[in-house]
Amino acid sequence: MTNSQFRLTAAVAEQSPVVTATGDIDLANVGEFGDTLTKAAAQSDSITVDLSEVSYCDSTAVRALFAVAATTKLALIVPAEGPITTLLGISGLDRVATVVTRN
């Protein structure tokens, strides 16, 4: 599944990198997603990834998030409800990352 509206931005806020993704994250763009996460994580011992505007996330994206969580303190911003929030629970990402919900 590919969405032409996939966008990725990285910035530093309060000494910690923040990566914001929108649209679908899947095999077509997970390379860019993973590279951005790795570069951001190299800048700090913690990283925040805002997934609140992500509409779809496949297992390759989950794997990229687990890879970052293995070496860096990871915080994820997600909608209060929906498929991305459900995916965090099913995959176990909610046990290795701090999850912040947004309405």
Feature map (PLM): residue ranges:
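STAS-like cytosolic regulatory interaction modules
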Residues: 1-103
